[in-house]
Amino acid sequence: MEQQYKTDAEIYAVLEREIIDLTIRPGSSLSENPLCARFGAPRSLIRVVLQKLQENGLVRIVPYKGTTVTRLNRRIVDELIYERTAVEGRILRDFAPIATPAQRAQIRARVDAYEALARAETQDFNKLYEMDCRLHETWFAAMDKMYLWSTLQNAHADYSRFRMLDTMTTGGLDEVIADHRNLLNAIERCDLAAFEPLVERHLYGGIRRLGSKLTEEYADFFEPETVK
C-alpha cells in the first residue's frame, strides 16, 4: 500500500498524472478494490475519484461492468491541433511587436531549460511536458489570454496524452528543441510572417513523427472508428 491519501483530490492527482503520462494505458481497467488497497482509502472515496475522472473524459464507468481508461479520439486530437495552430499563431503575431526585454529573456530561459531537460542523461517526461507548457504559456500570459490557454490545456483526455505519446516514443526532442529556437528567433526579430508556418510545423510535429505508428503500433490507444 502506498502512503495514506487523505483526500479525493490527492488520489485524483495521482491517477490523473498516471493516465496522462500513459503509465496507465488507454483501455486499461481500473477496479475499485485494488485502488482501495493501493491508496488505503474507502470505496466511497475511490468512487468520488473515478466519477471526477469520468467527468474529465479520462475514464468511462459502465454500471455492473467496471471502469476503463478512455482511448484517445483521433478526430478530437486533429481538431485541437488545428484550433491551437490558429490561436497560437495569432497570439505570437500580436505578442512579438510588444515583447519586453524581460519577456524575451524569460522565453530564452525556458527554451534553455527545456533543452537541458531533453539532453539530461535520464529524461523525466513529465518535467519535459511541464516545461513545454510553461514556455508556450509565456506569450498567452503576456497577452492576457489565460482563459484561452486554460481551455487548450484542459483537453487532457485526448491532446495531452497524444503529446505525451509523441514525447515518450518518437525520439523527436531534437526537432522540438529546434522548433523552440526558431520561435524564439522569430520573436526576437519580430518576424510576423514566420509565425504561422513555424507554429504549424511545431504543433503538427507529433502527427508527423508518429506517422504509421498511429495506425499500427499504437492503434489500440485510439478509438478504432477515429483512426484514419
Language model segments and positions:
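Short linear motifs at protein or domain termini
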Residues: 1-98, 212-228
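Generic structural "secondary-structure junction" signal
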Residues: 26, 164-167
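Conserved amphipathic alpha-helical segments that form helical-bundle/coiled-coil interaction surfaces
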Residues: 101-165, 175-189, 194-205
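Solvent-exposed loop and edge beta-strand segments that line ligand/cofactor-binding
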Residues: 168-172
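Short arginine-rich
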Residues: 204-214
